[in-house]
Regions:
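Structural signal for well-ordered, non-membrane alpha-helices
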Residues: 73, 77, 118-121, 125, ...
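Intrinsically disordered, glycine/charged-rich C-terminal tails and inter-domain linkers
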Residues: 1-32, 177-240
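Catalytic NTP-binding/metal-coordinating core of nucleotidyl cyclase/transferase enzymes
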Residues: 30-112
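Catalytic core of nucleotidyl cyclases, primarily class III adenylyl/guanylyl cyclases
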Residues: 83-109, 127-161
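Short glycine-aspartate micro-motif
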Residues: 46, 135-139, 183
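Catalytic/regulatory signature loops of cyclic-dinucleotide turnover enzymes
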Residues: 141, 164-188
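Acidic, metal/cofactor-coordinating or nucleic-acid-engaging core segments within structured domains
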Residues: 112-115, 122-130, 181
Length: 240
């Protein structure tokens, strides 16, 4: 059959071709990629957002699950536009928000993650909970990631991203102990100053300094690591 011959020829071309890539922090560079063997590599902070209850929602019907997914999609896409990040639909239950190092320091991205958690869990609670229990978690890590095009039109959410940074952010998100938690890697945590790691609370009328983040151990690629998680939120309203 001719289509099998065509597939074989294309597969052979791809397997023999050099996998070229360009190092950049400019997402507009995506327009110059093709669907064959070119990619971009960038150092960036990745915010991985997981809708925790899509598997449960699927039991009530595919349309219901897809409707909920679209609600989260719209909110996160608008947040990414507002904050200047790069938005990507990663899976039927998750999204990536990507912030290049050259334009965003780690503290800025952690602030965005905490504000996102606040907006989704509190600001959008009412419309979301008309449809479902609002249940998500966020994982954040920093490092090199590679993106390659899967379709010739090059839309951002049709770029496939690879990297240990993404895998670690996924693992951190999956270990969230409660809904709405933001988890960050130790690499990200140790880059934050005290204004991001400590806060003041009144306990029994006494003003006390408390930790914003709780440390926990986990295994990643058979190596013991630490992550830090919090349910302290910040608000986008603080920007106004």
């Amino acid at each position: 059959m001719s289509f099998i011959k065509d597939i074989f020829q294309k597969t052979t071309e791809l397997s023999d071709a050099e996998f070229d890539y360009s190092i950049t922090s400019d997402f507009n560079f995506i327009d110059s990629l093709n669907e064959d063997c070119t990619a971009i590599v960038m150092e960036a902070t990745v915010v991985y957002f997981e809708i925790k209850n899509i598997p449960v929602l699927l039991k009530t019907g595919k349309r219901h699950a897809a409707r909920v997914y679209k609600i989260y999609y719209n909110a996160l896409h608008e947040i990414c536009k507002h904050t200047g990040g790069f938005f990507n639909c990663y899976s039927p239950t998750s999204f990536l928000m990507i912030y290049p190092k050259e334009k965003f320091d780690l503290a800025t991205v952690v602030n965005i993650a905490m504000k996102t958690a606040d907006l989704i869990s509190i600001g959008l609670r009412e419309p979301i909970e008309k449809l479902c229990h609002n249940n998500f978690s966020i994982g954040v890590d920093h490092g090199n990631i590679l993106g390659t095009k899967t379709l010739c039109n090059g839309k951002s959410n049709q770029i496939v991203w690879f990297g240990r940074t993404i895998e670690k952010a996924i693992t951190i998100s999956s270990l969230s102990q409660r809904p709405f938690f933001v988890g960050i890697s130790s690499k990200v945590f140790h880059d934050l100053d005290e204004s991001m790691t400590k806060t003041t609370k009144h306990i029994l009328g006494i003003k006390k300094e408390v930790d914003v983040w709780t440390r926990m151990s986990y295994q990643f690629e058979n190596v013991k690591k630490h992550l830090y998680q919090t349910n302290f939120h910040k608000s986008f309203d603080e920007e106004e």
